[in-house]
A protein has these predicted regions:
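Conserved beta-strand-loop surface patch within small alpha/beta domains used
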Residues: 1-62, 74-113
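A substrate-engagement module of RecA-like helicase motors
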Residues: 116-132, 137, 185-187, 191-320, ...
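Walker A/P-loop
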Residues: 154-176
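Signature of the SF2 helicase/ATPase Hel1-core->accessory helical subdomain module
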Residues: 173, 179, 199, 204-207, ...
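A contiguous, basic/glycine-rich beta-loop/short-helix subdomain that forms a polymer-engagement track
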Residues: 284-315, 331-341, 487-626, 686-697, ...
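Conserved interdomain hinge at the start of the Helicase C-terminal
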Residues: 566, 625-660
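Conserved RecA-like P-loop NTPase helicase motor core
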Residues: 613, 625-635, 686-754
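Conserved helicase motor "Helicase C" RecA-like lobe of SF1/SF2 P-loop NTPases
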Residues: 660-687
Length: 754
C-alpha cells in the first residue's frame, strides 16, 4: 500500500518530526481526514515507549483515524491493536500502523467512504420539489442555505448559518442532512427550542420531504419521559372515596379515575399531549414516568410501558426530533459514561442540527444550574410523608409502604418496623419544620422594604453577614444540618430492617420510598451547595414571589463554554447551528465564544449569513405607544388595555398577543374577553387547550386572537392573512440587573473585556 493514498505529504512530515522528537518510540496520533478521506492533519494524543503507547479513544471523534508507529518496522498489529481498532471502528473510525519513516503503512480498519450528495437535482424548474409541488415556491435564499449545509456534510465540517425570516430554513437543512444520512446510513438529530417547531417539523415539513426525496425513512419526535404516563404509579394510587376526603382530594381522585379510563380505553401512547383536557403539573407528577422511579424490566407493567414502547421506535429512526433541554440532559449522561455509550437517553448519532440555536447558551446554562425552592421542598417532603393526609395512599410513600408491609409481614415483624417508622416520621417533621423556617426567613429577608410581587436578588454572603435575619437563617441551618444527619441515620435503620425481609415488592412500594429518599439526599446537597455559596464560577441568587409566598434559590454557572466544547464540540464535526438571530455586527464571534465554539481550533468552522427574502419596509410596520406607563408600574397592563383593544380591532383579530408572564396574560384576557363578541371573534387562551390545538383553532377560526406566553414567541408557522399582527406587551430581554446577567457582565469586565 502507498502511504500517500491515505496520508498527505504534510501530515507524513509532521509525523516523522514527532516520532523523531520522541526518540523513535511509539506515538499515538489523531488523524483528521479531509473531504476526500486523506489524513491532512495529525495531532499527538500520547507518547509511549519502544513497544507500546496509551490509546486514548476518548480523545477521538467520529470518522477520524487513529495512527501509531511500530519502531521495529514490523507492522503486524498486536491483539491489543486489533481490539482498540475494533472498538473505534464501531463508531466509524479507522486505524493505521506506520513505520518510523512513515513510508510504509498497514491499514487495520479503513476509513469509511462517505457518499457525497448534491441538492441541485431537487431545486430548479425541473427539480423534484417543483415536480411534486408545482406551487411550492423555492426561494433563492433557501437554495443557498441548502448548498452551504450540503458542503458541511460532504466536507465533515461544522456550520453556523444565520437565516433570516422567510428563508424556509427547515426544508433547507432537512433536505441535505437527510439525503446525507440516508446515503451513508447515519442518524440525524434535529434539536429545537420549542414544541411548536417540533410539531411543525413532524406534521408538515418532514412528510413534505418524504415526498420530495422519494426515499422511505423513519422519523420520531423524542419527548422526555416525563411526558409519558407511568402505569405502575397510576394504578398504585387509591381512588376509593372516603367520608373524610376533602373537596380537593375528591377532585384529585376523580381526575385519577379519568386518567385510568384514558389509559385503558383511549390512549395507545400514554403521551400527555394526547389528553383532550389540561391537567395540573402537581397531579401529572404523581403519575408520570420518571427515571429514578422506574423499575425497568422488574416492573409488572414493563411489557405495556408507554415510555419503553416509545423508546423502541427511536432505535431504527434515521431522524430524531428533540428539544434542547433533552439534548443537554443526554449530553450530561455522556459526560459521565463516555460520548459513545449505551446508557444515554438518545441513541448514538452522527449529525446534529440546532434550530433556534440562539437558545443553546441559556438552555445549557439552565441545565447546569442548581435550584431549590420552598414549594419544591414541601412537595418532596409531602411525597415522602404528607402529615395532612395520613390515612390514605395520598399520605406519602412511607404510608403506602407501611400498608404493603402490614399485608406482607407477620404481626411481630410489622410491629418492629412500625416503631422504626415512627422514629422516621418524628425526624421528618423536625426536618420539614426547620427547612420551611429557613425558606420563610429568606422570603422575609429578600422582600423586606420591597413592594414588588417578584424580586430577583443576588445572594452576597459577605454583605449579608451583618444582617440579623441572615444570621438567623444560618443558625437555623445548623439545626437543619443536625436534623438531616439524624434523619439519614433513622431512615437507613428503617430500610435496612425492611430489606432483611427479602420482600418481592412487585408493586414497587419499597422501591418508591427508597427513590424518594435518594431525591431527598440530592435535594439537601443542592440546598447546602447554594446556601454555602463557596464554589467559584457560579452566581448565587434568589427569586422571591410574594403573592403565593415562595423563594427559589439558584447557583448558576457564569460560563458553559468549556462544558460544551469538551463534551460535544470536540467529539464530532457534522453540526449545523441555525437561527434568524446569531450574528452581532455580521460576525459570529460573540456567539462562538458564548457556547464554546471559539475554542474549536482543530477544524475550520464555516460561517454564513443568508438574508431574509422579505422586504421589511414594504411588508410590515412597527407601532409603539409613546405614552404608555413604565413597565414596572403596577397599572402598566391596565393602561395598555385600550391601546391593545384598538390594535386588535384594526386588523379584526388575526393576532398573537404575547406575554412574558401568565399573570399578565390572565389579567389582559379577563379585561378584553367581554369587549369582543364571541360571534365576531375567537379568543384562544393558553392552558385552555393543548398547544398544538391552539394553533389549529387559530388557523381555522373567524377573527382569532391568541393569548400566549414563551411557547408562542418562536417556532410558530401560520401562513397568509390568518395572522396579520403580533402584539408584544413586554420584550423578553434580560434586564441588566437580572442577577445572572449582572454576574456575567461583572465577569466579562473582570477579564478586561467589554
Amino acid at each position: 500500500m502507498k502511504v500517500a493514498e491515505f496520508i498527505s505529504a504534510k501530515a507524513m512530515e509532521d509525523m516523522r518530526l514527532e516520532i523523531s522528537e520522541s526518540g523513535g518510540n511509539e506515538v499515538f496520533f489523531r488523524g483528521i481526514p479531509d473531504g476526500e478521506g486523506i489524513v491532512s492533519e495529525v495531532e499527538v494524543i500520547a507518547r509511549g515507549n519502544s513497544s507500546s503507547v496509551a490509546a486514548l479513544l476518548n480523545m477521538m471523534r467520529k470518522n477520524e483515524v487513529i495512527i501509531h508507529n511500530h519502531p521495529s518496522g514490523v507492522l503486524i498489529p498486536s491483539d491489543e491493536d486489533v481490539s482498540i481498532s475494533s472498538m473505534y471502528g464501531e463508531v466509524g473510525g479507522a486505524s493505521y500502523i506506520v513505520n518510523n519513516a512513515v513510508d510504509d503503512i498497514y491499514v487495520i480498519v479503513p476509513l469509511k467512504e462517505f457518499i457525497k450528495i448534491d441538492v441541485d437535482e431537487y431545486f430548479g424548474e425541473n427539480g423534484a420539489i417543483h415536480k411534486n409541488f408545482g406551487k411550492f415556491e423555492v426561494r433563492r435564499e433557501q437554495y443557498e442555505m441548502a448548498k452551504f449545509i450540503e458542503n458541511s456534510m460532504n466536507e465533515n465540517k461544522k456550520l453556523i448559518v444565520e437565516a433570516g425570516t422567510g428563508t424556509g430554513k427547515t426544508i433547507a437543512y432537512l433536505l441535505p442532512t437527510l439525503l446525507y444520512a440516508i446515503e451513508n446510513n447515519l442518524k440525524v438529530i434535529v434539536s429545537t427550542n420549542t414544541i411548536n417547531l417540533q410539531e411543525q417539523l413532524v406534521n408538515k415539513d418532514i412528510p413534505l420531504l418524504k415526498k420530495i426525496i422519494d426515499e422511505d425513512f423513519n422519523y420520531q419526535i423524542v419527548k422526555g419521559r416525563g411526558n409519558y404516563l407511568c402505569k405502575r404509579k397510576l394504578y398504585n394510587i387509591d381512588v376509593t372515596e372516603k367520608e373524610t376526603d376533602t373537596e380537593e382530594e375528591k377532585t384529585e381522585k376523580n381526575i385519577i379515575r379519568n386518567l385510568i379510563d384514558w389509559d385503558k380505553n383511549v390512549t395507545r401512547t400514554g403521551d400527555r399531549n394526547e389528553l383532550k383536557y389540561e391537567i395540573s403539573n402537581s397531579i401529572w407528577e404523581k403519575v408520570n414516568s420518571e427515571a429514578d422511579m422506574c423499575k425497568g424490566v422488574k416492573c409488572p407493567y414493563y411489557s405495556k410501558c408507554h415510555f419503553f414502547n416509545a423508546r423502541k421506535n427511536i432505535a431504527d429512526a434515521t431522524l430524531l426530533i428533540v428539544n434542547h433541554h433533552m439534548f443537554f440532559a443526554d449530553l450530561a449522561i455522556r459526560n459521565q459514561t463516555g460520548f459513545y455509550t449505551n446508557y444515554s437517553i438518545l441513541p448514538n448519532y452522527d449529525i446534529v442540527v440546532f434550530d433556534e440555536a440562539h437558545n443553546i447558551e441559556d438552555t445549557a446554562r439552565n441545565y447546569f444550574t442548581f435550584e431549590t425552592s420552598k414549594i419544591s421542598f414541601g412537595r418532596l417532603m409531602g411525597n415522602i410523608y404528607n402529615r395532612r393526609v395520613v390515612n390514605s395512599s395520598n399520605g406519602g410513600a412511607i404510608v403506602r409502604l407501611m400498608t404493603y408491609l402490614n399485608e406482607s409481614l407477620s404481626s411481630e415483624e410489622y410491629e418492629k418496623v412500625d416503631e422504626l417508622k415512627e422514629d422516621v416520621i418524628a425526624e421528618l417533621n423536625v426536618f420539614y419544620d426547620k427547612g420551611i423556617d429557613i425558606f420563610d426567613k429568606l422570603i422575609y429577608l429578600f422582600s423586606e422594604n420591597n413592594d414588588n410581587r417578584e424580586i430577583k436578588i443576588k445572594i452576597d454572603k459577605q454583605k449579608m453577614r451583618s444582617n440579623k435575619a441572615f444570621r438567623e437563617v444560618m443558625e437555623i441551618n445548623s439545626q437543619f444540618k443536625e436534623s438531616y444527619g439524624n434523619l439519614v441515620i433513622r431512615i437507613n435503620k428503617f430500610l435496612n430492617t425492611v430489606s432483611n425481609y427479602n420482600l418481592e415488592d412487585k408493586e414497587g412500594f419499597l422501591f418508591e420510598f427508597s427513590r424518594y429518599y435518594e431525591r431527598l439526599k440530592q435535594y439537601y446537597k443542592k440546598f447546602e451547595f447554594i446556601l454555602e455559596g463557596k464554589e467559584e464560577g457560579y452566581v448565587y441568587w434568589a427569586n422571591v414571589t410574594t403573592v403565593r409566598p415562595n423563594v427559589k434559590l439558584y447557583a448558576t454557572p457564569f460560563d458553559i463554554s468549556d462544558e460544551l466544547n469538551d463534551n460535544l464540540f470536540t467529539k464530532m464535526d457534522r453540526m449545523v447551528f441555525t437561527s434568524a438571530t446569531l450574528a452581532v455586527d455580521n460576525k459570529f464571534d460573540y456567539y462562538k465564544k458564548s457556547i464554546g465554539l471559539m475554542k474549536e481550533n482543530r477544524r475550520k468552522i464555516d460561517e454564513r449569513i443568508v438574508k431574509s427574502p422579505f422586504d421589511y419596509e414594504k411588508q410590515m410596520k412597527v407601532y409603539i405607544p409613546e405614552d404608555a406607563l413604565d413597565p414596572t408600574n403596577i397599572e402598566f397592563m391596565r393602561d395598555l388595555t385600550g391601546f391593545i383593544e384598538e390594535a386588535i380591532r384594526s386588523t379584526k383579530g388575526h393576532c398573537f398577543l404575547l406575554f412574558t408572564s401568565y399573570s399578565a396574560l390572565n389579567f389582559l384576557y379577563n379585561q378584553l374577553k367581554s369587549r369582543f363578541s364571541e360571534k365576531e371573534y375567537t379568543l384562544i387562551k393558553q392552558n385552555d387547550f393543548p398547544r398544538h390545538e391552539m394553533i389549529e383553532i387559530f388557523k381555522n377560526s373567524k377573527n382569532p386572537i391568541l393569548f400566549g406566553t414563551d411557547s408562542f414567541w418562536e417556532g410558530v408557522d401560520v401562513q397568509g392573512e390568518q395572522l396579520k399582527s403580533v402584539i408584544i406587551t413586554k420584550l423578553p430581554f434580560k434586564v441588566p440587573n437580572d442577577p445572572v446577567t449582572e454576574a456575567i457582565i461583572e465577569n466579562i469586565r473582570k477579564n478586561g473585556q467589554n
